Amino acid sequence: MARRLFLLLLAVTAGLSLTGTTVRAVGINWGTEASHPLPPSKVVELLKSNGIVKVKLFDADPKVLRALSGSNIGVTIGIQNSMLKSLNASVKVAESWVHDNVTRYFNGGNRVRIEYVAVGEEPFLQSYGNQYKPFVIGAAMNIQNALVKANLANEVKVVVPSSFDSFLSESGRPSSGHFRADLNKTMIELLSFLTKHHSPFFVTISPFLSFHQNKNISLDFSLFKETAKAHKDGRKTYRNSFDLSYDTLVSALFTIGFSEVDIVVSKIGWPTDGAENATSLTAEAFFKGLIVHLEKKTASLPRPPVETYIESLLDEDQRNLSAGNFERHWGVFTFDGQAKYNFSFNHKNQVNAQNVQYLPPKWCVVNNNKDLSNASARALEACAVADCTSILPGGSCSGIRWPGNVSYAFNSLYQQNDHSAESCNFGGLGLITTVDPSEDNCRFSIQLDTSHSSSQTPNFFQSWPLLLLFLLSGLF
């Protein structure tokens, strides 16, 4: 063990001269899983006005890429997991994808500064099993070959975002870090590919999930508080959760022979709703601590990430909830581009999205003059298809009582369906009002008025776990 620790120390110390001691850039993830997404042109204005110089996308939406043209923002475009099998099977499919989603944006004066193609979105997530893993390396190779054929391989690098659970240490000590046993062979293949083509290793670091899943990780330790109890590993002392996870990854890379690969933290964040300690105050404390920590020269990070991408720009009311109700609340900004807390990318004041177009100031609430014996059942129906995560335990609206929480559910469906009168019927129990029913910190939102509105109900099978939670928690 002592020899292994010594070799690991040599490896990370050697990296000091290769990567420097400060983070090169902080970017942000821009997801679009929203029923009423903020128009891409508004989002690009938001990025530029807040000094955000890099953005990571989860797909290659033409509307988004057109909005980014000429912005000089560094862009990572994503390939969804559902495409991996076909990309692995056919070079022609990969060439077609590169032509449609990369090459066309390099032509003309308003080009998009595409820097990376991310093959898959955390395809090694443990809950996926072998659903995507067999196709990842082949898909990445075919995309790489397609970029070579298009004469773009020197400008655009191929990467594969790895999940927070792809590496671990059963003992909790970073020096014992390793990749999951079922991933070892795949990781060696992936890292060999990345090293050959001078591409970085993209990976999620999640102090928030570490805090929620590990009773030995305190909130203060997660938020970079100086008062946090330190964790020791041999002679090394860890004073925050980020360093603990990051060095576990460094050790895992060293263990399989890739200690010098550049690391990009492709996702790191703290949600503001949907779970205990998921608040604007804790998110602000986390990000301020993170940025200060990444910017300062510190011996605790001898090989800092070359880039870091915050999760995420905006809240998204259509995100899958399998990981938790907080999934729809990662945004630094609300769904309509309004800052949730004081945090700056460029050491200046935050700038909100400007001239946002909303639906008229109307809400749907429960009609207290009706027989409400069936109101709870109607609220459950609404929450099966609309976003009600804020009224679940730990949410920002969990404190409002019945029938206020019923009104919240009614309004969520009403807003999602663009104020259609039918969506506020609920068997005669709904009432459309122009009086804002918001209570204290519980905001009854008005949706965006945008031509990009989907006005559709989410897949019920995506929402049924939330419905089950409502039934079990007895909120209604």
Swiss-Prot record:
The active site is at residue 122. GO terms for cellular component: extracellular region; plasma membrane; side of membrane. Keywords: Cell membrane, Cell wall, Cell wall biogenesis/degradation, Disulfide bond, Glycoprotein, Glycosidase, GPI-anchor, Hydrolase, Lipoprotein, Membrane, Plant defense, Secreted, Signal. A lipid is attached at residue 453 (GPI-anchor amidated serine). Its EC number is 3.2.1.39. Disulfide bonds join 364-424. Glycans are attached at residues 88, 101, 184, 216, 277, 320, 342, 374, 405. GO terms for biological process: carbohydrate metabolic process; cell wall organization; defense response. One of its GO terms (molecular function) is glucan endo-1,3-beta-D-glucosidase activity. It is an enzyme of class 3 (hydrolase). It holds the Pfam family Glyco_hydro_17. Its main location: secreted. It is found in: Secreted, Cell wall; Cell membrane. Residues 1-25 form the signal peptide. It is a lipid-anchor; GPI-anchor. Contains two additional disulfide bonds. It catalyses: Hydrolysis of (1->3)-beta-D-glucosidic linkages in (1->3)-beta-D-glucans. SMART domains: X8 (SM00768). Residues 454-476 form a propeptide. Belongs to the glycosyl hydrolase 17 family. This is Glucan endo-1,3-beta-glucosidase 9. It comes from Arabidopsis thaliana.
